[in-house]
Amino acid sequence: GVGERNGLHPINVMVISLLLGRSLGMKSEELHDLRVAALIHDIGKLKLPPHLRQPTPSMIPMERTRYETHVAESVALAKRMGFADAVLTAVARHHEMCDGSGFPQRLKGPDLGRMSQVLALVNQYDRMCNPARGVTALTPHEALSVIFAQLKARFDSVVLGAFIRMMGVYPPGSIVQLVNDRYAIVASVNSSRPLRPK
């Protein structure tokens, strides 16, 4: 249900963000801060009424504005907990996009920082695969395709390229049809042969 999905979202974002951070060559301290930021990026949603914790296409502007306050709430809670400035910055920018279409500050590419760019991309990807109520979930392959084909201007090209290489053409969890017409679920990516997952 929705509660389980909301509980798993920070874990999903943390695991995938750490894998992406490593593939981008982030150092140990950066990975530590990224791990913390990924786990707490949505903690401010606890201050919202339950019906506003997930964005839906049917939200009216006033509800959308209230939903967007979860970013400031998350930063305030993280600050009170004494987290590092790098963590606070990543949490503050986890909905910012390279093309300026994000929120709350409508920042653009160079202003975002690598950690925030990773968090924004992985957050978007996980929400596409594990969406809020009333929204159809995409398979990992479909989510990657949509991000690359329709949303790539929102993300840093280096971060997005590394993400696609890391996830592979057929990301884990994708259902594929084999040459013998049987179906299989991809268990892992073969980075040296992306068209031949395991």
How does the language model describe each region?
Residues 1-198:
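Histidine- and acidic-residue-rich, metal-dependent catalytic cores
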